[in-house]
Amino acid sequence: MEEKRKRIGIIATRNDPVLLYAVRELKRYLNASASLEAEEREEPTEERYDGYIELVIGHSLPNFSFGIEPGFDSGTGKPVLRLTGRDATGVLHAVYTFLEEMGIVFDISGPVVTKSFEYDKIWDLKEFVVPAVKWRGIRQHINFPMDISSYSLPDAREYICNLARLRMNCITFHSYPGQWYDLPSGELAGNFFYGQRYPIPRQLSPYIANENLFCIPEIERHDEDAPSKSQAAIQWLGAVMQEAKAVGLKVRFSVELRDHLDRAGLEICDRILALYPLIDELELITQECGTWAYPVLPARELEGLIAELFGPEVLEDGAIRRILAEACRETDEDTKAFINAGIWQLPGTLKELSNHIRLANELLASREERTVPELALGLYATDHSTLKIIRRILETHMPADVRCSLLPAHGARAVENSLKAMEVDRELMRNCMIYSWVEFDGNMYLQQNAVEGIGQLLKFLTTSQDNKQIYGINLNHWRTAENKTAAKYGSLTMIRGYIEPEEFYESYAQSLGIADTPRYASAMALLDETDDQVRNRLSNIGFCFADCWWNGRLGYFGAYEPQRITTIREEYKRVLELFQTCRIDTATANGSNDLELIANRIECTLIHLNMVEVMTQLQAVCGSLPPGTLSEAQKHDVISVCTRALGYCDEYMEHYCRILPDRGSEGTVISYYHTLPSVIHKIMELYVTGSIEESKPDSHADAPPSPAI
């Protein structure tokens, strides 16, 4: 005889949309259990319920806190579990804390039910959480095919819901020019992926949820009508923001004003705020690394630029002059010039920061005339000398009521190093959003793991803040399924505080039913270390934008050292062996699927490294020769090398397509098709035919800066 389902009454006020969402989520998962049945009730008065779960906002609780408290109802004598939070978002997070205790694993790729709910366990749960980080979330560049900017609206909404299920409470959307806002001057939105187009080739069409062009599926029909596409893009992002607000996320919007000064910059801000009234915080951020657009300046001229932009008083204590002196060396009798790899970042960063400070002050002063949300000044710079100088300028020039955001490095481990070098002070960090990485876009085509870097950042910030709550961390994120482990770790450590990676790996593997948890932990740790070596020794070897691979000659293929590729490849092989061993005794579907995906992606990584290594053979064939000067034998060698490399490209895409768990995986493979094979064909054409003009990449609406390697 089938056991009768236990009936639970859910009690909550109905005056808050986030609370209503919390009730729906709780009912959804309780009713999915074979042993439970849940209904909404106004108060615990009916005898037919076996117990009650009450959702309560506790205004006296610490900010951002949430908890679980068992008890009994005095009227009915029935057990009551109170899920409490400082606000409605906190209550929602208490709901997810409860559900995870009951046996659900929430991942960025979706929930996983790992065991049946036990009714009696409900009434023994007790927990109270003051998160280590106040504002916890994701930073979406919405700029590449593998992130949510290619998702259908239902898929994008579900992604947002999964962030809430990870108990995140913040999302930052970044828009490059021409992508997500239009302007009265006639510039349109809808130039997705920097304006680079991704027609779907026949070999990939069975795997892609578009007819002819890879983009948001609902917007594909607008492709030939630029104004219509622009409006559709804005409506799509507005709907995603609406979902974010419904699940309790703070919405931050980040924009680069570039050379739009004063009135032009204000018009952009006004337009964005008119298009997206749900924005809680507007961030004006400098371009990545100050861009290549500004000339390198000698130290004396740079001192003059600093004094011109921020006043001569910022130089008076000598600290900035000392930083400049340490960052430079003598290049002639009279001038110290910036010569290290990152020092060119400073002029552009200074000019844009100065402009943003003026605009922030003007926005604040005009609050009676316009609706102004919270404001932030963002800095995207990775050079340590630049960061040190900017930090000192912010100490005296940061407007009141304006927050700071820092994106200080490429890659999770490097963020902590940059903050240490920057010598951040406690006062600046008190209201500062730090951007780190779930994955680094420079290694997008490789399997990554950012757990160690995220953890070290938490540990550093906690220490530097004297163990007080950290203001905010948002993690850059593109691919979903491939990076769910790092995203899970990030979400947990931002709540609990620093967690030892090994402890996390073993617990996470156990929850998924992976058999050999110590071996899984070893595999993930080695993957993390190998990923960091790639970033340090093979910079941007997995970058996903064609123009950055090709400079009119061999591009990146002319820079990589084959021996380094060989060394890294051997490390990835070791990682793969560990994961394959884990698969042997893993019987659960959840664990097997997880291991199968990561093994596939490491195999793809090895194929990609093979391709790049083959292409480096051209260094000896034509690396020192101008196009159009090769002998017939050399041209034959170019064709042979490129043909072999293209074979590896086909193998990569074929293997990747064996497991496509989400839209981001589709985006990765279509991006690969239009990046590496395209560049290889251009190189082959250039050196075999000598046709330089025809081999130049297509122009785009915008492009990421080509990183130095």
Predicted feature descriptions by range:
Residues 30, 87, 163, 284, ...:
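Conserved, mostly hydrophobic/aromatic
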Residues 149-162, 264-272, 387-391, 453-463:
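Short, acidic/polar
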Residues 39-64:
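Short, well-ordered secondary-structure micro-motifs within conserved domains or adaptor modules
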Residues 243-250, 261-336, 349, 353:
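Hydrophobic, small-residue-rich alpha-helical packing segments that form membrane-like cores
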Residues 20, 45, 124-125, 292, ...:
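Substrate-binding groove of N-acetylhexosamine-processing glycoside hydrolases
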Residues 2-25, 29, 61-65, 69-264, ...:
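Feature activates predominantly on carbohydrate-active enzymes
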Residues 184-224, 300-344:
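Charged, glycine/proline-rich intrinsically disordered loops and linkers
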Residues 140, 173, 281-287, 377, ...:
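Conserved beta-strand positions
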